[in-house]
């Protein structure tokens, strides 16, 4: 049987990425051009800057992916692209490149939801068993998703305010840490103790909604008041206390969801899934009867490899889009 090759494009935020997937789950290439250095001085992603960087490198990413995979355009069977959610300007750059490439090479276009990509990155670890529950944690999203079968997603809980990754970056900025702050906070947290006792919003309520704005505000107020009074704060303990509160919230809601939706598999994905503290808590707090599947670190952040892994499923269902496909920056799972 002829091998199948899918080229995937991801540009929803501040990474330009192009990947090549062979057959169902063999990633031959996953080129990622990161913009982190460009956004550090701003303390966050500047949409206009992100869009310009995508324009500068996207063609090179296509070339590098094909070269690394050892194939040419005529070997490809489809092109997949993230069409939302994300920054509209950033999405449009990747979509324009993907659509032009698909048109020039007479290839079908597969539209992929960015968050579905994060979820399906877990396919790199093992073939997923359905139905399953997913905890998706990133800079822009915090969601619990019930997946009855491949491609059938239902959000059963989400944040009412800040996403968990956003909260990490905001408190990191207050402490003077480098953007993005998640990894550094995680490392410092492992050296400290939970001594500041921050609030855990809605942790005892039965619903599956999250909230991190109160935790963020409590952290900022503590830090500000200490500065005003000239009191010294222990950085490691601050990070440990903040992370303990975040993880308590995430684990409490996930455990409630597992009781409500009796599944055998829990996928934890998104940029924050790289957090070692979260991985440790999942190992100790989640029942051994639940198969916890977390993508490898290389597939936790934004990358086109995860888009390709999601696209393999959509290809089988012949879920193709016309070249009139437009970016949907606020795309939800229910829109699939």
UniProtKB/Swiss-Prot annotation:
Its main location: cytoplasm. One of its GO terms (cellular component) is cytoplasm. Keywords: Acyltransferase, Cytoplasm, Iron, Metal-binding, Transferase, tRNA processing. Its EC number is 2.3.1.234. Binds 1 Fe(2+) ion per subunit. Fe cation binds at residues 114, 118, 302. Coiled coil: none annotated. Its cofactor is Fe(2+). Substrate binds at residues 136-140, 169, 182, 186, 275. It comes from the Bacteria. InterPro entries: ATPase_NBD, Gcp-like_dom, KAE1/TsaD, TsaD. One of its GO terms (biological process) is tRNA threonylcarbamoyladenosine modification. GO terms for molecular function: iron ion binding; N(6)-L-threonylcarbamoyladenine synthase activity. HAMAP family: TsaD. Belongs to the KAE1 / TsaD family. This is tRNA N6-adenosine threonylcarbamoyltransferase. It comes from Streptococcus agalactiae serotype V (strain ATCC BAA-611 / 2603 V/R). The gene is tsaD.
